Amino acid sequence: MHIMNSSQTPNFNPNDIVLNITRVVEDGTRQSALASKGDDWESVVGVLDNNEHLIGKEMSVNSHLNAVMFSEEFNKDYEKTLPIISNYYSDLGANEDLYEAFKRVKNTSLNEQQRHIVKDSIKGFELSGVALKGNDSKRFKEIQERLSVLSNQFSKNVLQATNSWKKSVSVDDLNGYGEAELSKVRVGGEYVVSLQIPVYIDLMTYAENRGLREEVYRAYISRASDVGITPVKFDNRQVMDEILKLRSEMSILLGLSNYAEYSVQSKMVDSPEAVIDFLEKLVELSHLQATTELKDLEDFAGHSLMPWDLMFYSEKLKQKIFNFKSADLKPYFPESSVLSGLFETIQNLYSVKLTEIKEDCYHPDVRVIMLEDENGPIGKIYFDVYARENKRGGAWMSDFQGLYKDSLPVAFVVCNLNSPKDGKPALFDFDEIVTIFHEFGHALHHLLTKVTFPCAAGISGVPWDGVELPSQYMENFCYERGVI
């Protein structure tokens, strides 16, 4: 029986993340030197597994806090950790002695899971430039470090550009809004629209003011660019350009033609051509239906439509055909009912129980959910559901740790949905419910794992073109009458 103890709870108030990362990386470097001399599973992979578990915990909580509780002070320290981490993994991937140790392990007696892990690890060394020498090896390491910094800069620019734009409007500008929509943008005695997702979707869907829809749409799609109205200091154009050039250079160093060839090396799909064929087939299958639906919308509107018109007239057409407004659904889906239905669905599917527990966390809105079966705790989920200004947009699941020895899996589930207003509960629309089920599908994938090796437990080591299967499976239950 497993027990969730303090070591399985993330430290959401780290004192010195640079020192902490430096410490675990230095220890990892010492342990990997020992592993490079090993010749069996325990002396090689077992040692590295322990390293990965400890380093992964430090990295994941830092990355999570930077995404959901962004501040300039924390980000400054977070950026200092990126080269340390990048250099550690670059050195690990280029370690020829460790590479040879894995090849020795490959020739020992292994079970199916172990064979899979060793095979993927050997490929990982090769994609990390283990065969490169001299200046090529040095340049590869420089590229990896720079890419880690640029990736963080890109996300930071998008977040800050999103937060930089606000517009005060009159209530007349918001004709078409109901009280629920108005409450989201009411600030004191005025109304302020922003680029936060819940506000943006409401405005695109319900605002009669076409000029305002266009203004907000253009501000949203041009965030962090040189053509938008957000500050030029957040422009990601040069960041993207450098990322593309470095990815190309990195791929060529490995003997590949382009980054697409590099990317598919760790995917289920076997070639860039297969990806293009799939996308072209998807266009072929969907184009006729999309064209028909657009014509129906334009006939209904009485004029050609621009992107900022599509959600608005789709909602209007729905109301005309079905005498139904999407917002009318929301009172039937308060947050408590949605989570109760989600928990019941998961319990019926997997014979597990989900219980909300009390725990100090990085923000009072975060729900902490324990997953248990008849033998005790299985794992834990930190559910951060509401949109905030210092929080990265979108929805995702990430892991704090996987199933390993006495450690149970812990996951972060993040959304950017409506928050309670004026003492009233948060109300969700159907698409938001689908999002919640989707992200919990990822969390279940991680928590219900039976694999106890960190590099393959839960979502770890799963190709990105396969990892969406459990989450999309969970989405389907939103359409089941018994669940709704």
Which sequence ranges carry the predicted segments?
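Short His/Asp/Glu-rich catalytic/ion-coordination signatures at enzyme active sites or charged loops
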Residues: 5-16, 62-81, 104-142, 192-237, ...
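Divalent metal-coordination and catalytic microenvironments
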Residues: 17, 133, 255, 346, ...
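Catalytic Zn2+-binding segment of zinc metalloproteases
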Residues: 256-257, 441-455
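Short pre-active-site segment immediately N-terminal to the catalytic Zn-binding motif
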Residues: 334, 417-437
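N-terminal helix-rich structural modules
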Residues: 2-176
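Active-site recognition of the HExxH zinc-binding catalytic motif
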Residues: 431-446, 471
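The catalytic-center signature of Zn2+-dependent metalloproteases
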Residues: 449-475, 479
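Active-site-proximal, well-structured secondary-structure segments within enzyme catalytic domains
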Residues: 113, 117, 146-149, 156, ...
